[in-house]
């Protein structure tokens, strides 16, 4: 996953600077993810393909839905292209990790947007790069997604 980390750090910085996620890097996440997950499957004998695909769908549906419903104004196509790759990787770990990662990214992005509005650095309609928040949520999902998901489900008796 070192290759994925290098790509994601690059995308994070580029999106902050230019408010876009370039296709050559975004699309590269797919073969990197698939190869990395295949290596993991071969090494462990664990092939949670259904969970990985569900993770990809969990990430794609809300982000793609916002892009479609807003005519591309509420979310960039780079975010739409990146999301399923991130969800695929987190879904391989577990659906809970995919959900935690996505929700974390949304929450952090929302809090930052509100703070920017409160301090006058943004207003309604201001373009705020969302890729860094997706990548941050992905990192949270990778590191603590399973633990946070289990704790949340346990708190509600599931």
Identify the meaning behind each predicted range.
Residues 29, 61, 136-143:
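Hydrophobic cores of alpha-helical transmembrane segments in multi-pass inner/ER membrane proteins
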Residues 115-140, 152:
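Interfacial loop-to-transmembrane junctions
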Residues 88-92, 104, 113-120, 138-142:
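Short basic/hydrophobic patches in alpha-helices and adjacent helix-turn junctions
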């Amino acid at each position: 996953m070192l290759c994925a980390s290098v790509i994601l750090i690059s995308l994070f910085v580029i999106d902050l600077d230019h408010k876009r996620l370039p296709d050559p890097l975004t699309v590269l996440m797919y073969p990197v993810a698939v190869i990395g997950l295949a290596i993991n499957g071969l090494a462990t004998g664990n092939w949670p393909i259904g969970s990985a695909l569900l993770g990809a769908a969990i990430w794609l549906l809300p982000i793609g839905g916002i892009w479609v419903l807003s005519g591309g104004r509420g979310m960039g196509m780079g975010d739409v292209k990146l999301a399923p790759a991130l969800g695929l990787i987190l879904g391989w770990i577990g659906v809970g990790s995919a959900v935690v990662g996505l929700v974390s990214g949304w929450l952090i992005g929302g809090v930052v947007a509100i703070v920017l509005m409160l301090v006058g650095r943004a207003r309604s309609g201001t373009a705020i790069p969302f890729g860094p928040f997706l990548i941050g949520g992905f990192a949270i999902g990778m590191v603590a997604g399973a633990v946070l998901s289990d704790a949340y489900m346990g708190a509600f008796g599931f």
